[in-house]
Amino acid sequence: MLEPTPMLLAAFSLGLALLPLLFFLRRWGWLLIGWNECILQPIHNLLMGDSKEQRILRHVLQHAVAGDPQSVLETIDAYCSQKEWAMNVGDKKGQFLDAVVQEQQPSVLLELGAYCGYSAVRMARLLPPGARLLTIEINPDYAAITQRMLDFAGLQDRVTVVLGASQDIIPQLKKKYDVDTLDVVFLDHWKDRYLPDTLLLEECGLLRKGTVLLADNVIVPGAPDFLAHVRGSGRFECTHFSSYLEYSLWVVDGVEKAVYLGPGSPAQP
């Protein structure tokens, strides 16, 4: 029988010591987000003299194929999985988004939170002829990057980037943007805005029977009040899709699909 070497014993001891940390990080995946967004990213920005979002755009412009949305998505996914983590919906959870757009064939689609334009490109590439996507982004730098990403992908005619806060823009959708009701809403902005904006969409008469809400990151960072509402109000039929945090293989996350049943609908069993 082989005697354990000091190096092997040290590695085993280190592994045991790190197990609680690994469990903690798996359970509290927001620490991964905090580490990337609050520590690594500011250091990288300082050293590089630009922002992560600008670096993502530059990488796409240099390495993706112009006019090819799939190439744009794959280039962003490769960068964010290999170089710098970013809060896109990502390739794995993006498949749920693809499925909703393909199933619903929406005429009017709303996105809350554009970030760098990844999900806008992902949805717009699947829209049927004549359909349109409105994407609301509060950060002017992100909105500008999203527009450039859409232009590069050749999707600028299908998407309108709206700069502003969701709570300010939503009440303007009917009159200013000629929206009657929405077919699909993708929520991927501030998680504490998921519930207020869902209620605002209802209040403004923008949801019809069958409107699909798809909400990202309902586990990490989490949107418990939103989940409680759509699952408990009786006005939505919900399906949860378990997955992992974007560009992570071990932080459990999920996407919630909530189909609007109409006001005053009976509670679902």
UniProtKB/Swiss-Prot annotation:
This is Catechol O-methyltransferase. The modification Phosphoserine is found at S265. Catalyzes the O-methylation, and thereby the inactivation, of catecholamine neurotransmitters and catechol hormones. Also shortens the biological half-lives of certain neuroactive drugs, like L-DOPA, alpha-methyl DOPA and isoproterenol. It comes from Equus caballus. GO terms for molecular function: catechol O-methyltransferase activity; magnesium ion binding. Substrate binds at K191, N217, E246. Its cofactor is Mg(2+). S-adenosyl-L-methionine binds at V89, E111, S119, E137, I138, G164, A165, S166, Q167, D188. Binds 1 Mg(2+) ion per subunit. Belongs to the class I-like SAM-binding methyltransferase superfamily. Cation-dependent O-methyltransferase family. Its EC number is 2.1.1.6. Residues 1-4 are cytoplasmic. It catalyses: a catechol + S-adenosyl-L-methionine = a guaiacol + S-adenosyl-L-homocysteine + H(+); 2-hydroxyestrone + S-adenosyl-L-methionine = 2-hydroxy-3-methoxy-estrone + S-adenosyl-L-homocysteine + H(+); 4-hydroxyestrone + S-adenosyl-L-methionine = 4-methoxyestrone + S-adenosyl-L-homocysteine + H(+); 2-hydroxyestrone + S-adenosyl-L-methionine = 2-methoxyestrone + S-adenosyl-L-homocysteine + H(+). Residues 26-269 are extracellular. The chain crosses the membrane at residues 5-25. Pfam families: Methyltransf_3 (PF01596). Gene3D superfamilies: Vaccinia Virus protein VP39. It comes from the Eukaryota. It is an enzyme of class 2 (transferase). PANTHER family: CATECHOL O-METHYLTRANSFERASE, CATECHOL O-METHYLTRANSFERASE 1-RELATED. One of its GO terms (cellular component) is axon. Mg(2+) binds at D188, D216, N217. Keywords: Catecholamine metabolism, Cell membrane, Cytoplasm, Lipid metabolism, Magnesium, Membrane, Metal-binding, Methyltransferase, Neurotransmitter degradation, Phosphoprotein, S-adenosyl-L-methionine, Signal-anchor, Transferase, Transmembrane, Transmembrane helix.
